């Protein structure tokens, strides 16, 4: 009866209120059969296959199911159009959420560059999960739970951070974090306000905090308007290279990773023929260090689309590179083959 109640309710909301996406809190408390049945029921509706469905692949504690929970461990049993919040991607990029001081790749954690490749491929080329398709992976670094991205970046570097103060390094690391997950396969997700360095003044869980702490501070949107523009440019750039949003389980196989000095990460991805991509291929580099780095470019002519500060260079006069380019500190640098 509980399963029937869930399915009937969700179908009603989708049909009567035209809700086009469902997020399941603590999805691991439900069983695989129920969650798959919800997906199957939605798919019977006109346009139902376009309705998003994803959730938290954990229980938040114990479970009476003991097996077949709709969690990360049973990802292979879930429909390939049921997504999960990927904490592997989150923690690889910015560091663990339960230890405020634990760094991730963007803060210089040693050895973390190995997992960045897994995150870029939505873990489709890894034995860690693995998903049926990249569309099962929700790539993100911050949500309503735990520290905001801005707070986490400051907590890693300072014993007593000034959360409302400007910080150039944190700003650059914020851009790098966004530059990684917004150029990765999967379904990108960001917390409201991440694009203007949202802070909750170091509160890890603010569900019991005041509205003043939880509100969106629109003055920060003005203060950090360049960061807002950076996110806007990355989202527009991503939309012009559809292969990054492919649901094909084999799409990440086309990624070619370069051999670079550690901890730099670089990769090339050709466009899918006929998908209307603006460039023949993407070439992307991540530099989590505090110094500039020179890197070789693949054969061809490469237009710089983003230098790690401006993500809208592709809208202006073409800056074309061949043979070599220099990466700025704490940057995600993106090139398009022309």
Language model segments and positions:
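The substrate-binding groove and active-site-proximal loops of carbohydrate-active enzymes
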Residues: 1-3, 20-30, 159-169, 215-221
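A short acidic (Asp/Glu
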Residues: 32-36, 64-66, 202, 295-296
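Carbohydrate-interacting/catalytic domains
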Residues: 167-171, 182-196, 200-338
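Active-site neighborhood of glycoside hydrolase catalytic domains
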Residues: 1-63
């Amino acid at each position: 009866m509980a399963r029937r109640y869930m399915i009937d309710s969700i179908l009603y909301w989708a049909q009567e209120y035209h809700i086009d996406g469902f997020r399941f809190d603590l999805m691991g408390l439900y069983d695989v059969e129920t969650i798959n049945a919800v997906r199957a029921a939605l798919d019977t509706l006109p346009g139902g296959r376009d309705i998003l469905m994803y959730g938290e692949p954990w229980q938040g504690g114990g479970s009476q199911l003991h097996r077949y929970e709709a969690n990360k461990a049973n990802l292979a049993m879930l429909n390939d159009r049921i997504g999960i919040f990927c904490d592997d991607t989150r923690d690889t990029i910015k560091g663990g959420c339960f230890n405020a001081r634990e760094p991730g790749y963007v803060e210089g954690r040693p050895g973390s560059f190995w997992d960045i490749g897994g995150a870029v491929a939505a873990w489709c080329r890894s034995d860690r999960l693995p998903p049926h398709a990249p569309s099962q992976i929700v790539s993100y670094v911050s949500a309503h739970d735990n520290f905001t991205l801005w707070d986490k970046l400051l907590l890693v570097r300072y014993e007593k951070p000034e959360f409302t103060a400007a910080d150039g390094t944190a700003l650059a690391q914020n851009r790098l974090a966004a530059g990684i997950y917004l150029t990765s396969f999967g379904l990108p997700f960001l917390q409201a306000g991440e694009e203007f360095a949202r802070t909750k003044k170091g509160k890890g869980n603010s569900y019991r905090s005041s509205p003043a702490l939880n509100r969106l501070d629109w003055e920060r949107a003005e203060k950090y308007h360049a960061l807002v523009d950076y996110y806007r440019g990355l989202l527009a750039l991503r939309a012009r290279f559809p292969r990054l949003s492919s649901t094909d389980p084999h799409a990440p196989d086309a990624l070619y990773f370069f051999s670079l000095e550690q901890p730099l990460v670089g990769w090339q991805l050709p466009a899918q023929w006929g998908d209307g991509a603006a460039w023949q291929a993407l070439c992307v580099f991540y530099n989590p260090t505090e110094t500039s780095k020179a890197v070789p470019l693949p054969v061809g002519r490469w237009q710089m689309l983003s230098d790690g500060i401006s993500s809208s260079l592709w809208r202006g006069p073409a800056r074309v590179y061949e043979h070599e380019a220099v990466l700025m500190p704490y940057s995600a640098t993106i090139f398009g083959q022309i």
